[in-house]
Each structure stands twice: as C-alpha cells, then as structure tokens.
C-alpha cells in the first residue's frame, strides 16, 4: 500500500502554528517523522490561510524538502509531497518549487476545475488524485461513482497522464452519517478496478470514521475490506501504529507481500501492534 501521510495540514492547530510562525524546521521534522513511520508521500495543506494559501503552500513545500547542505542534497532524495488544495493558483505555486515528482490532491470531473488544473498537472508531470465527482455533485450509488470515475480517467488519459500516475478516489463518506457509505466506496473500487486495472485506487481512510468513537478501529476494519476490493494507496496518519500494522497484515493475507516478507520484517523490528 502506498501511504500518503496526512499530518501536515493546517486544520491541525500545531501545524497552523508552525506555518503562522514560518517555522520551517518544525515542518521539516513533521515531514520526516511521517516518512520514517512508513509514508511514501507527505500531504501538505495550507487551506485554512485562504488568501495567503499560495505563498504559504509554496513555503511548506520548500520547508519540507529543505536540505542542510549541498552534500546532503546530493546524498538524499527529496521527500515526495502531495500538494493538497482545490486552488489551481496555490497548486501551481507549490509545484514550481517541488523537487521530484509530486502528487496533486485532487482533481475532479467538474468542468471549470478540470480545465484549470489539468494543464498544471500535465506540465509538471505530477501524479494526481482523481475524485469520482463532477458538476452533478457527489455520486449516490456505486454505479454512479463508477461512471463518474471512468469519465474522469478517460479525460486524464486523453490528456497524456500515464495510468500509473492516476489515483482514483471513490470519495469515502462517514458511516456515522450514511451507514452504506463504506459499502458504496468498496463496491466502487471493485467495479473500477475491473475496468481500469492499470490505475491506482486511493482514499482518505479516516473519512469513514468521522464522528465515531475509537476511530482507528473503524479505520482498520474499512482498510482491510477496501484493500480486498483493490485499494492500493491511502491517505492516513502513519504514526497510527495499529493502523499501519493492520495494513501490513492485510497485504500478507491478500497475497501482496511475497513470502510475508514485509510483515515478518516488521515483526522482528517490533513494529507490529
């Protein structure tokens, strides 16, 4: 499972304080913590700053990818970041300073958003999270979500985005508000995986448990079922050790971990919990 660490988001008070104070070292430390915990990308979001979002999102990217010396830059690859914003201006500003391939979170089938974001994504050769959402709004059923997802992926492919750079998001909603939300998302992944075997499938894992107690437990249950349907990436808190352990276990059970190698290595390192 490809992990996108979700913690560098200014909706969290501690992160908002880092950004307000322009504490680049703190941003860098938070990004590194997530990579060390198993994240492959680190999500960066400055959306709560609204009018200052473009400049601050750009600054967050520079801070998270900062290196201490020219030698360090040569010896280590930059932390890959997931640029999280609905604002095309902010996304472009962040991509202009990002080193390596970024991921953009997210694009939809909404005509205006698609027309403004697609050239930016294509020009910077970014990976992209593609939401099963269009001008008609959120899908009510798995079949509707599948149709929206197929149309959006076809548009991305026609624009030259490689299938391996596309991460389809079924748009997971809280089961506390809609008891069928998780089932709909899982079925959407299954249906789209059959039609689009070369693209990836991702979701914001914690969305499913919003409003519930013991959220990590609900997240773990949903993750295993979604992975069985074809989910191969997730936006989550990599410092949630029980959740990360559950993902390793699910990969082993689903035959995605050759000879259970990653699971056994994590056990020997004392990381399973």
What is the role of each PLM region?
Residues 23-34, 113, 149, 218-223:
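Short, acidic/polar
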Residues 3-29, 105-109, 135-144, 208-216:
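Active-site mouth loops of central-metabolism enzymes
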Residues 35-68, 75-82, 170-182:
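Glycine-rich, proline-tolerant flexible connector loops at the mouths of alpha/beta enzymes
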Residues 25-26, 59-68, 73-111:
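Active-site cofactor/substrate anionic-group-binding motifs, chiefly glycine-
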Residues 1-3, 40-43, 78-82, 101-104, ...:
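Structural preference for beta-strand elements that scaffold enzyme active sites
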Residues 15, 46-53, 81, 88-89, ...:
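Short, small-residue-enriched loops and turns at beta-alpha junctions
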